[in-house]
Amino acid sequence: MTKKICIAIDGPAAAGKSTVAKIVAKKLRFVYIDTGAMYRAVTYIAQKNNLAYEDETAIAQLLQKTVIRFEPGEVQQVFINDENVTEVIRSLEVTNHVSIVAAHPAIREALQERQQIFATEGGIVMDGRDIGTAVLPNAELKIFLLASVEERAERRFKENVAKGFAGDLNQLKKEIEERDHLDYTREHSPLKKAEDAIEVDTTSMSIEEVANKILSLAEQKINN
């Protein structure tokens, strides 16, 4: 029987966390938890309810009444209560404001509690900004993915084109730099590498190479 470890994958925006985490989870037959989608879902409910993204109290109160759940699929399906929000939480409006909502301590605390509940049984791969430091500090394997701003902007640009969005590469670079600044400097659970995390610079690596490296590390932990 496979040992059910917890794998934490952290890193900045567009470093390839979600794509790699999904591949790793599928290969190991673990559950994938997309914490970024949870923050996007909260940003979307703020937008839908005409709340200011800076209004921490109002958003936190709304979150208390909200169920966020995942269902498996070719693309993991995200639901807010019974509404499928898988596509809408990837909108440019949500993308450009999620770092503001994610910086609120009340939101981070509420979502971290939910994320820790998901992980109680083990056998999960969770990606985000603070998984190895705040959400799963005892995860058996912690990975910190890095890539240059240029590389990350190129990846995001290609993703947007594939989805039918027109994009401006220089604007994407600017947006990624702004998100990095917000993520690294926020007061509550900033983006940082856990002391025991293994750093992987993905700049010149394919998604498959990154996934295979993490799978090799995971198998060492599982077989230990």
Curated annotation (Swiss-Prot):
GO biological process: nucleobase-containing small molecule interconversion; pyrimidine nucleotide metabolic process
Entry's family note: Belongs to the cytidylate kinase family. Type 1 subfamily.
Organism: Listeria welshimeri serovar 6b (strain ATCC 35897 / DSM 20650 / CCUG 15529 / CIP 8149 / NCTC 11857 / SLCC 5334 / V8)
Disulfide cysteine pairs (residue numbers): none
Annotated residues for binding of ATP: 11-19
A GO molecular-function annotation: ATP binding
Assigned GO CC terms: cytosol
Protein name: Cytidylate kinase
UniProt keyword Glycoprotein present: no
